[in-house]
Amino acid sequence: MAPQLLLCLILTFLWSVPEAESNVFLKSKVANRFLQRTKRSNSLFEEIRPGNIERECIEEKCSKEEAREVFEDNEKTETFWNVYVDGDQCSSNPCHYHGTCKDGIGSYTCTCLPNYEGKNCEKVLFKSCRAFNGNCWHFCKRVQSETQCSCAESYRLGVDGHSCVAEGDFSCGRNIKARNKREASLPDFVQSQKATLLKKSDNPSPDIRIVNGMDSKLGECPWQAVLINEKGEVFCGGTILSPIHVLTAAHCINQTKSVSVIVGEIDISRKETRRLLSVDKIYVHTKFVPPNYYYGHQNFDRVAYDYDIAIIRMKTPIQFSENVVPACLPTADFANEVLMKQDSGIVSGFGRIRFKEPTSNTLKVITVPYVDRHTCMLSSDFRITQNMFCAGYDTLPQDACEGDSGGPHITAYGDTHFITGIVSWGEGCARKGKYGVYTKVSRFIPWIKKIMSLK
């Protein structure tokens, strides 16, 4: 009887095992609904192993104390824990103007650079003229611990203390008929290769002319002046500074017996309609260094054309209009720290459109990028003094060649245009790695103001 009873019990057990398995073991997705995974107990040997963040907190859910045991450093633990709990709040880079982000639980903290504040460092504190020019439209200077704005001549400071309001219809630096941004922007010139390449020659030639520039619109460069010799020919350019003052290059002055000036023209082919303005006096900088010998001569002066600046005083005032407006004269600090740190400037003139061809009858205009001083000096066989700077392109197959010396290099800041350079000299035409060289106007602001104040 006993063997039969034992057999029955064994058969009953074997029959019940599949049923038990189907009732106890569930799929993981279903089990997770009501089963919460708990930390497994460490084995005897695991307790004495060094802490491992992957084992403690990635493979399993850990506590902050367990994370601290791994890092053994409170700051590192806090950094890890803030991300571990709810993700990295700094992943979207919420701090503006290069502020530093520190993650928190459900929040973040921005540490701002000097002159910035706000939750995201979004507010600029204009306590320095180096930060966005102190929010000034024109000139900025530091007074005690604050910035103070001022404006160019013929403008007044706005009630907000930052803006500059024109006091007349023909305030300096305003070109009412400016080229639209698409045409005038530097990237378009570069990509379409419409811009002229300003380069230098085998010998430093003062006769730099704009080659392959775009035709200027009437009123686009209203500060442009043209110097005419006794034969009625264009020989140099200039920049209108006031009703009786025109800025030009010193080396232009000894090229002719007499000088007349034309303003407000973009086409000088019709000599019978153009109006010649008479000159009263010409002031050449006393330190100007003319070339005394031809290039290649053993005594050739490699600092020729230093102090290449002159001012023409008119007999009768220039009449301003939409097409005749002076360029604004900057302060030295504004020119050096703001204007010449822009991407590019604007050059215009009636120069030759091709090497050794006649001068252009129509005004040409180009945009040229500033070139850093180190690159400028390395590119030249001649000395680039502190009174000079370079601008132009080093690879595009356009060039400036033979001509419009004395003409304006203008830099826009907002809607106002300031004189920053005078076309001075160059080394050849279309030579790779060469640039146009300009007289640096910021070096001569006191001299210019002194000459303009003379009666």
UniProtKB/Swiss-Prot annotation:
One GO MF annotation is:
peptidase activator activity
Protein name per its UniProtKB record: Venom prothrombin activator hopsarin-D
Which BP terms in the Gene Ontology apply to this protein? blood coagulation; induction of blood coagulation in another organism; proteolysis; venom-mediated blood coagulation
Q: Which family does it belong to?
A: Belongs to the peptidase S1 family. Snake venom subfamily.
User: What are the leading ranks of the lineage?
Assistant: Eukaryota, Metazoa, Chordata, Craniata, Vertebrata
Q: Which cysteines are joined by disulfide bonds?
A: C57-C62, C90-C101, C95-C110, C112-C121, C129-C140, C136-C149, C151-C164, C172-C328, C236-C252, C376-C390, C401-C429
Top-level taxon of the source organism: Eukaryota
Q: Which residues are glycosylated?
A: S92, N254
- Species annotation: Hoplocephalus stephensii
Q: Where is this site: Not modified?
A: D103
EC number, as in UniProt: 3.4.21.6
This entry carries the following GO cellular component terms, namely: extracellular region; extracellular space
Q: Which residues form a coiled coil?
A: none
Propeptide ranges are 21-40, 182-209
Q: In what way is this protein post-translationally modified?
A: The vitamin K-dependent, enzymatic carboxylation of some glutamate residues allows the modified protein to bind calcium.
